[in-house]
Amino acid sequence: NFAINLLLPCLKKHNITIFLSTKVGKQTNKPTALLELAFYEQELFNQVLSPKINAQHSEQTGFKTFEQLHKIVDGGVRELNNINTEEGFNLFNSSQPDLVISIRYGVIIKSNVINVPRNGVINLHSGILPNYRGVMATFWAMYKKEQRIGMTLHYISDGTIDTGKVIDKSSIDVNYQKSYLWHVLELYKEGTQLITNAVNKINQNLTITSSAQEEGGDYYTFPTTAEIETFINAGNSIISELEVNEFINQYYCFNVKLSELTQHE
């Protein structure tokens, strides 16, 4: 949601349809810390805060909830987890996309979907490719004590993961006084600018240049409980309630007490 709101200014002259997947990755029985992270990334906003924002701040000046976005974008906001089925493909195809922008879409899309938009499918990956492919790249970069972390904008040209031609990269310094989630959100500010640059080139009928990824790199999955403990014992944190509170206040113009953030409704 945050990334979409950041992109709205550059997309305002275009017809937009937003398709959502309900999860990213297939792992079940996740460590407790990752379940808590999922609450702060998804349930807190979508199930707890969004209804309150919608009810109390229908005219608020902050970023929009998905319900509010549904009312202002041409194609609305729709859940689409089965994009590779005939029914899902037909729904996707009905939006007649010229460009698909993928940000944490939790389904590996197949060639029939990839071939629809004439400007291709571009994906914003929260890691520097090819070094950090897979999920939670920012976590793994911090786990390895990297001093800089980044995002990669690349094409999706087949069903493989994080292997397409690279359009651009961005990076920021790591602040180990801040949480993993804080860094993910900070990266979206830089990453969405990469998308904006690409969209602007399309608007000007310019070619988006890209290059094949370098050889090497590693593919990462969700961390285990032991790996999360190592991360925490090194002085890092996954989530900071104070940071989340400040984020909501700053971008969604909604004041909420810390006690409300921790009520897993």
Regions of interest found by a model, annotated:
Residues N1-E265:
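One-carbon transfer enzymes
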